Amino acid sequence: MTALTQMKCEACQADAPKVTDEELAELIRMIPDWGVQVRDGIMQLERVYKFKNFKLAMAFTNKLAELAEEEFHHPGILTEWGKVTVTWWSHSIKGLHKNDFIMAAKTDLLLD
């Protein structure tokens, strides 16, 4: 499979299929620092990034905002002192789409 970071998000309509259990098992191995959470019955990807201070956390948040705009796919972001919690899911299908895994992998690249 092509590296997730090399892929582009595709338009996700309300009738787009959610990832299957088999796809989930394969894709989650490609982003090992991410976990799967279920909130209000909606499966989501989540990761907490740690930083030395609020300024670094905010700089990461701003880079993530730019990436989200470029890909037209937007996460939940909670920025706090020393950490940023990022949550990816596809709002239109109320669950996980391949786009969410692509964006999780690209989010990890922002640390470099």
Swiss-Prot record:
Pfam families named among the record's database cross-references: Pterin_4a (PF01329)
Keyword Transmembrane helix listed: no
Gene3D superfamilies listed in its UniProt record: Transcriptional coactivator/pterin dehydratase
Catalysis: reaction(s): (4aS,6R)-4a-hydroxy-L-erythro-5,6,7,8-tetrahydrobiopterin = (6R)-L-erythro-6,7-dihydrobiopterin + H2O
EC assignment: 4.2.1.96
Keyword terms of this UniProt record: Lyase
UniProt xrefs under InterPro entries: PCD_sf (IPR036428), Pterin-4-alpha-carb_dehyd (IPR050376), Pterin_deHydtase (IPR001533)
GO annotation, biological process: tetrahydrobiopterin biosynthetic process
Gene Ontology MF terms in the entry: 4-alpha-hydroxytetrahydrobiopterin dehydratase activity
Family: Belongs to the pterin-4-alpha-carbinolamine dehydratase family.
Record protein name field: Putative pterin-4-alpha-carbinolamine dehydratase
Species, as recorded: Shewanella oneidensis (strain ATCC 700550 / JCM 31522 / CIP 106686 / LMG 19005 / NCIMB 14063 / MR-1)
